[in-house]
Amino acid sequence: MADVTFDYRNLLEVEGGLTGRELEEISPRLRAAVGTLLEDPPGFMRLPRTREHLEASLEVAERVRSDGATDFVHVGIGGSALGPMVLHRALSHPFYNLLPDRGGPRLHFAENADPATLSGILDVIEPEGTWVNVVTKSGSTAETMANFLVIRGALAEALGDFGYQARTVVTTDPEKGFLKRIADREDLVTLQVPPEVGGRFSVLSPVGLLPAAVAGLDVEALLAGAARCVEELEEQGAEHPAVVGAAMHHLMDASRGRNIRVMMVYADALERLAAWFVQLWAESLGKDGKGSTPHGAVGTTDQHSQLQLYMEGPQDKVIEIVEVREHPRDVGIPGAYEDLEGVGYLSGHTVGELLNVECDATRRALTGAGRPNATIRLGSLSAENLGYLMQALEVQTAVAGALYGVNPYDQPGVEAGKRITYARMGRPGYRA
């Protein structure tokens, strides 16, 4: 059973917080939005219960692992990379690639079109044991295809065409696109990105499931947590906490002028979750002059860089803390320097205890300063809890789209830059 709770009390009880009447007034719109999600579910709502994607991903992952792969390079950008990176960073050992007994290949993410990073990946992989997974629905994403062509060239040079082709996976649209044509031409292993699922909503498709399974993560539990979120939405409707959160964040923006939403995660392992959510919220809602600006932060690190602004800067933010109650591992603080009052008091505590105390201290300080804040609590950092949370945040984003009156599934604002890039790089049919 997933253990994820949403605490919105400090959006209601602080000075300038929301009122019960405001939530009552918006409730008909919430019910309508949830009704649409459940009656005509978008693609991401169906993923947790789609066995075929899970089974296909597990089958390919087993091929990779049984082949004795030393390296697995995941090539993608945006949601095609951020989602898989969340799963790996949150659920794997923090230094997974350095472990001598990982039980699986090293994972590398070729995301940005950065020559230094790409060259670095080529420096450390062992071509004879490397598998590549290239992820793009269209096969025309410039950054992804450029990275793929470079890695393909290096592997083909080292292994020959047959060797490269035998260790390349294509995750793309099942029917169309340039990458689909390449896969058919070279008889590459293929996984499907459902046509109705956009990249930023694709983490529970083969986009996220394959690299997670390659790393030995419990993808069954991940999907079970997400499915539980959908079940609770069906049971609770507009009272589901993810839906209530959509209303609160929308109202904080529309009626209070708090148009910056900070997700502050109190676990290094969740740093990529904040980055993933920034894309999800920004790209889904930032349209027609609407939408609030998401920002990621990590506690306690950013207490020493950003908290000053949150405490005493402009009243334009809502801080959302993500807290993990039980850490996968904890470390006791040994006794030393007992005569120094500024040091000795730490003895006998644990580092996890310090992290949780500072999390609560930040929440109390923000509330005391009249700064609205919310908390998402995970009982532990498990695959089931993470699946629930990511599904809930996707639901929240979709409902917020209805409240803002925008389509949360398109991204017209990024097309102009793509067209200019295509023209300047010489793609036929495009002019600068």
UniProtKB/Swiss-Prot annotation:
Annotated family: Belongs to the GPI family.
CDD domains: SIS_PGI_1, SIS_PGI_2
Gene Ontology terms, MF aspect: carbohydrate derivative binding; glucose-6-phosphate isomerase activity; monosaccharide binding
Compartments it resides in: Cytoplasm
Gene expressing this chain: pgi
Record-linked HAMAP family: G6P_isomerase
Pfam entry (one): PGI
EC nos: 5.3.1.9
Keyword Iron-sulfur: no
Task performed by this protein: Catalyzes the reversible isomerization of glucose-6-phosphate to fructose-6-phosphate.
Keywords: Cytoplasm, Gluconeogenesis, Glycolysis, Isomerase
InterPro entries cross-referenced by the UniProt entry: G6P_Isomerase (IPR001672), Phosphoglucose_isomerase_CS (IPR018189), SIS_dom_sf (IPR046348), SIS_PGI_1 (IPR035476), SIS_PGI_2 (IPR035482)
One GO process term, biological-process aspect: gluconeogenesis
Domain of life per record: Bacteria
Keyword Cytoplasm: yes
GO cellular component, one term: cytosol
Chief localisation class: cytoplasm
Organism: Rubrobacter xylanophilus (strain DSM 9941 / JCM 11954 / NBRC 16129 / PRD-1)
Active site (UniProt): E283 (proton donor), H304, K418
Pathway: Carbohydrate biosynthesis; gluconeogenesis; Carbohydrate degradation; glycolysis; D-glyceraldehyde 3-phosphate and glycerone phosphate from D-glucose: step 2/4
Catalytic activity: alpha-D-glucose 6-phosphate = beta-D-fructose 6-phosphate
Protein name: Glucose-6-phosphate isomerase
